[in-house]
Amino acid sequence: MKIVNVESTFNIHNLHFFLYETFILIPRQTPIQFGLQFFKFGGKRDYDEACEDWDPSIGVDQTNGNSNFNNEFSNNGIDSSNGNFNQFNTNTNNNNNNNNNNINSNLNNGLNINSNNNNNNNNNNNLINNSNNNNNNNNNSLSTSLSNNSVPLTISSNNQNSLVPSNNNNNSTNNNNNNNNNNNNSTTNNTSTTTTTGSTSTSITTTTTSGTSKKGERKRTKFPEEEVKVLCDLVILFGKDVRTILTFKPFSGGKYSERQIYDKVRALKRTGLVPTNPTSDDIKKSRFDLGIADNVDIQSLKSTKKGRLSNYVSNSSQSSDSDYSSSDHEDDDYIPNSTLSSSSTLPIPSNPNSNKRLIISRNPNQLSSTNVNNNINNSGGSSNNNNNSNSINNNNNNNINNINNNNNNINNNNSNNNNNNNNNINNNNNSNNSNSIHNNNNNSNNNNNNNNNNNNNNNNNNNNNNNIINSNSNNNNNNSNGNITPTTPVTSSRRSIQILQENANHLISQIQNQMSTTPPITPTSHHNAIPIQSLSNEIINTPSRTRERDRIEKEKEKLEKERLEKLEQKEKERLEKLEKKNQQKLLEQQKEQQQKEQQQQQKQQKNNRHHLDLTDDEDEDDDENSLKSDNSNNEKDVNLSNNSSNKGSGKLNLTGNSVFDYYSTGHNLSLYKSIKTSPSSMVTIPSPSSSCSSTSSIIGSSSSSGGGGGSSGVIGISSKYNYSFNPFTTTSITSLLPTTVNSNSNSSGNGSSNNSTPIVNVISTSNSNSNSNSFFKYETDNNLFIYYPFFNQNTNSNNYTFERDLLTLTVEVPSIFDWIKDKQPQNIDKKIKIEFPHPGKNYGPPRKVNKLPEGINGVGFIFEKIKQGSVDFDISIL
């Protein structure tokens, strides 16, 4: 147990302080436990009663009502302006006992700023000060703030003092009891029994950070599209060589950091914008786009700088490299905060309830082995103190510095500046641009106004960086009264503090060495790089490059031509295959159709030998116009309608006084046609059972017209050949042109007539085909015309005889049968014989028509009607 140094001015209050110090240092009793007992047994009440008898004029400046302890009291002080107990500061075992009266003026809102020769180690293991105090606190947290707010601890190298306040209403300062054996992580070693009831404190903030970011959280850098294209070409040529990429425009101007370029390269590779294994064509294209000639070696353009990335990049990613390597952050573009552009962050052990970050400057002019930070923003844990105040730690001097301003404006060295706008703590006597927080020899205890009167002007802080961590003396005081001799720092039992010191020193030395030996990244010279901006139009348009472009264009045209040819060839092959396929389908359909037709024909031949339904044949155009006449004056259309009927005679009723009957022989494949027209004069020839050939059948009959009696003749047609095939598949006679028969051209004798009647409106749309032995019968008032349309009339083999009322005609099969033979090979005898019976005594002998209308093939005969007398059957007249 330590004995408190008691002065001659000892009174009841000093006794109370002595007892307080004595009891608070009882072993195995924490400040929290003692504080509970203190309030439980009326310690607060007894203290208030004891204070009633104390003369407030002792050691009090009556001019402003503030306690002035400049040379009055050395250890203890009480704020008499409001009667509130502010702080017990009984630092013992100090070398400076009541001689210097040095007091550090510290901010009380959200800040625990520990200064000169006071080994104040907070519960977050933050290295704050080196002192000669014998602290037996296992946690090395002799004093911390009692803030309920978690304020991040930042040690910054910027030239502005960032003070992040807590929202505390009470601003009591806490003493450091050096001989405290505190086994729990208590943030204060004394329990303040007073609470200030002043107005809510105003926040004093001068921030250097825009906030803390979460682990792995990065801001993305937006690269313009043009820069992305250039970056893709550079990655194809140089891969992930960030330092080489930064030698090219637009990346060489310091616009982007190495980490930003590296992250963007990884994102491009991951998203596939840059091929993993670029081909020679890709490399050639990238060269062309970047303006790098083919004769330039890529290796010569690479940066010669070795080692890891810049400290800024490596430090900024140290805490999140493992997280950033995941796929969630590979395409993140990280933009550092503009206010932290010259700083890097280093994670340090921190309280789980707070977020602290150590910020180290990169500027070598602001670095020293003993000066690291300007500001400390500290949020502490809990204590038995009932107020939400932030403790202010004093030096090892036995003086009390009680800053209890409601507005929290701190002015140093006799300056009554109220810095409410920028909230900077200004030290007018500092020789540097930064703001010192250490104010020695200040005994002002101002609780009523906003101005802290610093009565001692002997302190000129010459710290370049306003260091809070001091291994040597940080204050060079002009007066001997204010000098504090630094001592060797107490080695902490916590290994984390040592590691933190080593890391900080190592980081400082590393930054200094790199800044002194390695220049910042700048655009490389023309010896190892060809920046894009240096390539002029003259270089681009040199003959070699022009030839190269022409060659590349020719190659592109050639490749395009080959591609088009291949496409055309493929299309041609496809069309050929399609055509062959269609032809094959047509052939198969034709074969199937022929087979169906043959089966149908055979079936019809078996079932009905005399009635076969056949389809029209479009190829028989020669048979459509069977009869034409040269006499254009008597041309009339003949309509012939064909309808199948029973076996017998077909009747053609013409519009005039003539009837045209169609006859067919009785062969096996003969087809019978019945032509019906409007009812007019019709002629019917009875078919007797005699005077017919055994092989012929009576097709039709014609009655005599006029007044010639009732006798009738038999018209019979016989053939020596009976064919077992159908000579035609399809035949249609669409029109039978008018035919004029001149009776005088081929006949002579009595009773001949020049009267002729043309065939009018004969249209045949037969569903079946005519047999080669079929014929047409055309009868007028004066003549009977028989026409065989399927034979050639001018061949020598055609001859006819008329014997015993029977006209026998021997003709040659026309060329149409050659076409039939090609379709159905048969042994066809082209010469056939046709027998036609004489119509009767009312008709004269047959006369052959030697000339038929042009374009009509066949054989025609005329039988002239005899109205009076008998018929001369002399064949010689023919």
UniProtKB/Swiss-Prot annotation:
State the source organism's domain of life: Eukaryota
Low complexity composition bias: which ranges? 64-213, 314-325, 335-355, 373-494, 596-605, 639-652, 679-704
List compositional bias (Polar residues) regions by residue number. Answer: 362-372
Q: Where is the composition biased (Acidic residues)?
A: 615-624
Q: Where is this region: Disordered?
A: 58-223, 306-494, 585-652, 679-709
> Where are stretches of biased composition, namely Basic and acidic residues?
585-595
Q: Which protein, by its recorded name, is this?
A: Uncharacterized protein DDB_G0288805
